[in-house]
């Protein structure tokens, strides 16, 4: 197309291989991340068809969803989890795919280690059999989750049929107030849009508040794009992006680096480019957020009350609210700050990076977890764990009564030993609060790392803006 183009349109146009008659365009894929849960059948399909992995140099695997976060890590008690992990090891060895296994210092959550290792780069198309692949869009990449059959397709061809999504601009002006984080921004946006407000769109986040975010904060924001229904979320690369990538293990070096930066600097939305939809948000209006229901759009500020379903005139929404309140065992009008928690989970591909752990450690330093609370911290990768231990953050957490774990997806989802018991209520830094997400009958409230840390100490949700740091 001619004329001003959006960042997404620039990436899309350079990756379309061909457009078959009456078929979706064929998109070339620059990076394919693989994990143990959505890959076994895909590799089986390759084997049955006698095919190879087309580009093993563009494919990287890790174990994260099912892995234990306690020692000994190599003892996997769940039979299904053990079979999936063993299958990934067998398949990676057979097909020549690099694997960051449990014994590797590079192991971690797939959406944490990709950027951490310098594998995620601006302008790329990136896929993984996981919905939160949108995380990598923080680097100015078109990154999206795919299903198992599509995993097989990419393994075999390094391409994927894809219909072109619509575009949405979310411009966040101003400055985030003290105590308000990228997680609060993400939840605030989803609360405004709803969980289907961005369906069929790729979101580009822009504005002064976005430019002020660190790369780790940008990853948190893009990670949760899918929770608003978006296909992907992305942020144009800038000097903050380049500084993060520079000198990472797999990042370009020397002349290739200089060439890369020059190309990446052009990856921005042209002035006058048109979006299918635009949303404008004033960062100054945001407050720390807490979800109260069973999807991320059921969210209010920490100083608000649990909403009353009777206040809405929409029958479907009222019924949804009523069901959520029943499941969450909450009453309308209850102040959020009076909701007590049993568990606190700091981790996940949303909030398990070093900045997240630093923020939480700052809150708990000098305090101790409430007697009624069981709290745990799960670093997003072994490298983050090592960095945190180098900084003494593990001691801060342990002294405060937190469990300090090995890396993995952990309590984000009920696919490993880290789950809630029925009826337990958890302040979680993860991205989904669906019924049973953290274990059958478990009740999940999504918050930022600092808010989760404060809840662990007080035993209930607490406005982090009023916290007395020691």
UniProtKB/Swiss-Prot annotation:
Instruction: Fetch the InterPro entries from UniProt.
Output: 3-IsopropMal_deHydase_lsu, Acnase/IPM_dHydase_lsu_aba_1/3, Acoase/IPM_deHydtase_lsu_aba, Aconitase_4Fe-4S_BS, Aconitase_4Fe-4S_dom, IPM_dehydratase_rel_enz, IPMI_cat
Lineage, top-rank taxon, reads Bacteria
Q: Tell me which residues bind [4Fe-4S] cluster.
A: 349, 409, 412
Q: Which cofactor does it need?
A: [4Fe-4S] cluster
What does the cofactor section's free text say about binding?
Binds 1 [4Fe-4S] cluster per subunit.
Under which EC number(s) is this enzyme classified?
A: 4.2.1.33
Q: Which reaction does it catalyse?
A: (2R,3S)-3-isopropylmalate = (2S)-2-isopropylmalate
Leading EC class: lyase
Q: List the disulfide bonds.
A: none
Pathway where this protein functions: Amino-acid biosynthesis; L-leucine biosynthesis; L-leucine from 3-methyl-2-oxobutanoate: step 2/4
Pfam families listed in its UniProt record: Aconitase
What PROSITE patterns does UniProt report for this protein, alphabetically? ACONITASE_1 (PS00450), ACONITASE_2 (PS01244)
**What's in the keyword line of the UniProt record?**
4Fe-4S, Amino-acid biosynthesis, Branched-chain amino acid biosynthesis, Iron, Iron-sulfur, Leucine biosynthesis, Lyase, Metal-binding
Instruction: Give an example GO biological process.
Output: L-leucine biosynthetic process
Matching Gene3D superfamilies, A to Z? Aconitase, domain 3
Query: Under the GO molecular function aspect, what terms does this record hold?
Result: 3-isopropylmalate dehydratase activity; 4 iron, 4 sulfur cluster binding; metal ion binding
Q: Does the keyword Phosphoprotein apply?
A: no
Record's function text: Catalyzes the isomerization between 2-isopropylmalate and 3-isopropylmalate, via the formation of 2-isopropylmaleate.
User: PANTHER family of this UniProt entry?
Assistant: 3-ISOPROPYLMALATE DEHYDRATASE, HOMOACONITASE, MITOCHONDRIAL-RELATED
| Family of this protein | Belongs to the aconitase/IPM isomerase family. LeuC type 1 subfamily.
Quaternary structure (record): Heterodimer of LeuC and LeuD.
Q: What is this protein called?
A: 3-isopropylmalate dehydratase large subunit
Q: What gene is it encoded by? A: leuC
């Amino acid at each position: 197309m001619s004329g001003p183009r959006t960042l997404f349109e620039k990436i899309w146009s350079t990756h379309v291989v061909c457009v078959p008659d009456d078929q979706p365009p064929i998109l070339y894929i620059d990076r394919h991340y693989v994990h143990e849960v959505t890959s076994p059948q895909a590799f089986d399909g390759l084997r049955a068809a006698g095919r190879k992995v087309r580009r093993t140099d563009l494919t990287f695997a890790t174990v994260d969803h099912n892995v234990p976060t306690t020692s000994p890590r190599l003892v996997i008690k769940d039979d299904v989890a053990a079979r999936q992990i063993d299958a990934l090891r067998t398949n990676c060895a057979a097909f020549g795919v690099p694997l960051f296994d449990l014994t590797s210092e590079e192991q971690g959550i797939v959406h944490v280690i990709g950027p951490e290792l310098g594998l995620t780069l601006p302008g790329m198309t990136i896929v993984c059999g996981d919905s939160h692949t949108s995380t990598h869009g923080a680097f100015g990449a078109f990154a999206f989750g795919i299903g198992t059959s599509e995993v097989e397709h990419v393994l075999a061809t390094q391409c994927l049929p894809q219909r072109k999504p619509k575009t949405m601009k979310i411009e966040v002006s101003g400055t985030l107030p003290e105590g308000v984080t990228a997680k609060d921004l993400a939840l605030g946006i989803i609360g405004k849009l709803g969980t289907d407000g961005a369906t069929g769109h790729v979101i580009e986040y822009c504005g002064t508040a976005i430019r002020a975010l660190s790369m780790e904060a940008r990853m948190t924001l893009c990670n949760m794009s899918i929770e608003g229904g978006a296909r992907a979320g992305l942020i144009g690369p800038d000097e903050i992006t380049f500084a993060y990538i520079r000198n990472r293990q797999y990042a370009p070096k020397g002349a290739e680096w200089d060439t890369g930066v020059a190309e990446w600097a052009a990856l921005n939305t042209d002035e006058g480019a048109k979006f299918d939809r635009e949303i404008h948000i004033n960062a100054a209006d945001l407050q720390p957020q807490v979800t109260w229901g069973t999807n991320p759009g059921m969210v209010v500020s920490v100083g608000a009350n649990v909403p009353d379903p009777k206040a809405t005139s929409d029958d479907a929404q009222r019924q949804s609210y009523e069901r959520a309140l029943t499941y969450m065992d909450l009453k309308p009008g209850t102040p959020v700050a009076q909701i007590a928690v049993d568990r606190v989970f700091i981790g996940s591909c949303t909030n398990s990076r070093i900045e997240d752990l630093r923020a939480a450690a700052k809150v708990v330093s000098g305090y101790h977890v409430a007697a009624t609370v069981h709290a745990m911290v799960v670093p997003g990768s072994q490298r983050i764990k090592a960095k945190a231990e180098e900084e003494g953050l593990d001691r801060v957490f342990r002294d405060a009564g937190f469990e300090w774990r090995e890396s993995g997806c952990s309590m984000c989802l009920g696919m490993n030993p880290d789950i809630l018991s029925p009826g337990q209520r958890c302040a979680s830094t993860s991205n989904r609060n669906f019924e049973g997400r953290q274990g059958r009958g478990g009740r999940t409230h999504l918050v930022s790392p600092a808010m989760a840390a404060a809840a662990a100490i007080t035993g209930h949700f607490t406005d982090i803006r009023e916290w007395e740091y020691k």
